[in-house]
């Protein structure tokens, strides 16, 4: 694991991205080829200028022109799917002055759909890691008076299996993981990778001709959207609890139509104005739900029972035939429309635990 950073006094420990790991491995392997010197530690410079040292688990020649180096990914205290995975690089010397060419080794995926920051057919090594690797290798080449090219194949042990726990299959990245990172540092529980995958999902849908997407809070809502709207998986966005991340992105980069589908409790949180729907960030407000029922004519006894309910669904059922679900969806629609602040067609649907609709609102103009 990488030597503890100055942040070690904080409760949560930062980690390093797969892009930083790949950079260290590429540099270690290339240095072995150009100088004959192996290493058990490698220093790299992050995009903002900070230097970090990574342990190199293995560094060896494969032949005269190629070498292998590997490190173990340390995500710090972040629950990263790649934490503990071995990232490796096979670096080779080639022809072409100043060129650095990239390919995917085992465990790194390939882009198969438009809309991402990489062209179709490219290995899923994102732009910042590519730039980091290129800059470090060209600096090494200058130090060693090397005028040729580098071919860099990046891989992750067991990456194909790990990728099934990520958004890569939905985004059209097949065969493995993506090599990620914009700062080189993993911030614990920052959720930046998940939010980035939401944005990428929107971009992929747009690039492939889908102008209607359904943002879903979970599996049941996704199943409902798939059945009810006949949308392909590419147009289904796993929003989860990050309503704000999606809505603010669509404010900057709109589509024609958005449908939000979620459990009634999650939709009630959005109706309250919460853009982070996770239980750690926002709570279901039974008073808010009861007040909405009161505006529809619920009796005092019903309102008292709703305020004392164990769950939002129980409160909804206590409202009986009152169109409470529709009203909560309308309030959520208003918050979402205000956040997007554009002319996108918008619909909000709330479902129960069985995946059945309990409320909907699509705006008076739709």
UniProtKB/Swiss-Prot annotation:
Its EC number is 2.1.1.195. One of its GO terms (biological process) is anaerobic cobalamin biosynthetic process. The keyword Cytoplasm does not apply. Pathway: Cofactor biosynthesis; adenosylcobalamin biosynthesis; cob(II)yrinate a,c-diamide from sirohydrochlorin (anaerobic route): step 6/10. It catalyses: Co-precorrin-5B + S-adenosyl-L-methionine = Co-precorrin-6A + S-adenosyl-L-homocysteine. Keywords: Cobalamin biosynthesis, Methyltransferase, S-adenosyl-L-methionine, Transferase. One of its GO terms (molecular function) is cobalt-precorrin-5B C1-methyltransferase activity. Belongs to the CbiD family. NCBIfam families: cbiD, PRK00075.1-1. This is Cobalt-precorrin-5B C(1)-methyltransferase.
